[in-house]
Amino acid sequence: MSRRSRRKKHIDHAKKPTAEQLAARTKKAVIIGSAVVLAIVAAVVILYLVSAGKKDDALASFDKKAELLREQVLSDKRSDEISGDIEEGLPDNVVFLSVCSGEERAKVFTGTGVDRKAAWLSAYNQAKSFIENENYNAIWLKADLMSEAKTYDTVEFSTELHHYRPEFFRYGIAFDKSFETAILEAELNGAKILDYENECVDESYLNTYLKKAGRSPLSSLPGSYVVFKCVGWMCDENDEVYDLISDIDDYGRRKVDTVDKEYAAELVKNASGFLIDQVKDDGSFVYGYYPRFDKNIDNYNIVRHASTLWSLVCQYRMTGNEELVPVIDRAIDYMVENAIVERNDEISYLYEEKSDEIKLGGCGVAVVALTEYMDAFGSDKYKDLAIKLGNGILTMLDQDSGEYYHVLDGEFIKKEQFRTVYYDGEATFALCRLYSLTSDEKWLDAAKSAVEHFISADYVQYKDHWVAYSMNEITKYVDDERYYTFALRNAQENLDTIYNRDTTYHTYFELLMSTFEIYDRMIERGIHVDYLDNGFDLEYFLRTIYKRADHMLCGYFYPEYAMYMANPNSILDTFMVRHDGYRVRIDDVQHNVGGYYLYYMNYDKLVDYGMLEYRDKA
């Protein structure tokens, strides 16, 4: 009998339920159904109440922050920064209010009015309507008050834009005189609306931005633009309000009274924490981001992997946080397992498979990272490997001339004599670290040979931070007056360039701080060289250190910068390179951490030598 027939037979012979049983079943079903309906209704009510509560909370938070900003916008506290240099025929009162959840690019609302209060109210009402309608949780609010405005035709604008490096035009643009379509500087640069190469506004990027922001795109670009500047204020997630700098060199980021020891420690902690978060399960890093459009950098460089390890160990030294240890170990293991090649039992190199290259600098920074790790953790775990890598460096050094060979291929065949001056300093720094690790004179002798070449070839001209690091390390063991003079010259003769540099140029700070440690060592040891009296300007040197410590904050992703990127939370509280599309890359962060770490370690001495007094005299 088929399965179907058996089932039919079973059904045919099944006992039919009574009327009472049917009624009971029906009653039970009704009760269950009613309970389900009630549960659904209750869930809907709860969700509604929760949603309404969240909406009320979001509105209350917005109103609190907005009121704090309103007080600033309507006050006269910064009247000296508001020149009133606004071209006739343009609105005198324009306020921009930016709101951001931290999860997406900020929304910006523009208000104009007969007075400042009316302009504020216009921007505020637009923003509040958005918060209500979208149930939007704005953790950051930023207010900008227009202080200057001038009309340029497109030819004049192109001429003006020609003078700026990418992302360094620090003015907003209105595309009509009534400011119906007005874009802040941070929006222009954050959404790539300015085409610096062709010195114009990119209509495609502009309209894409306007559409995504829910604003009307332009049918065509006008024949003239209103270029404007603002005075700004930032209210953060803790309802703290910061004045934003209006000077062009440091435009748009919060004013910091003094970049002191505690402030530097916080920068190092935050940025190193960012690096920790970039370590993947296999020990490699997320290499970097172009945050304007939240895009990963599709590349990897094992040399930068190695140098970044150094920053992770710095954070451990500062915090003693044991949770960092497995992350650091994982990142070192990745380097050791994937990028170390042996030439023989005595010689190893750091090898980059992608390019099939052995780079001198890579071997150098690998040694620095491993020795830093062993020193921080009181371990000799990587001693043998560090020595083998050091022997690899020696195969690339002509100790008679002090010159290095920079690049070998994967078969250990010479490929390129010179790649970058950085490699020389990195390798020499590593040799000095190996001497510290082993007390074997062969490392120090090799480092001396390289330093003699630095001096004879006048490496001062390269403004190289790795040379400064290597000089700082070797003068711990060698009291040669020529070494000290060269090290001081490496900073002094480049101070004008460093002091006046418009970009953050993070490696300059490392150069300065390494040189400061050398200077301090001279004073502590009572070492005097003629250059101290005839060339070295301590006041200018210390003033430059503070100037760079402060100016480099323009490369830090405070909320007021991050909020105009596509995914603010992903790059918050780390360092970036503005003139390369706000690039965030592990080595950029590492160099910033390196400079601020040394600043933190030496801050008390810097103050004792008069840094803050010299700063105030500038």
Residue ranges with predicted function:
Residues V73, P217, L267-S284, P326-E346, ...:
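Long, well-ordered core segments of solenoidal/helical folds
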Residues D247-K261, A306-E322, V365-S379, E426-S439, ...:
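Well-ordered alpha-helical scaffold segments within catalytic/enzyme domains
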Residues R105, F109-E266:
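Extended, non-transmembrane interaction/recognition domains
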Residues Y124-E185, D480-L553:
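Active-site/pore-lining binding-face segments in mid-to-C-terminal subdomains
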Residues Y300, D479-R482, N500-A618:
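CBM-like carbohydrate-recognition segments
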Residues M1-D57:
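Gram-positive cell-envelope targeting signals
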Residues V256, P291-A306, I347-C363, S379, ...:
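Solvent-exposed loop and edge beta-strand segments that line ligand/cofactor-binding
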Residues S272, V279-G283, P291-E342, Y351-E357, ...:
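Glycine- and small hydrophobic-enriched segments that form the cores of compact globular domains
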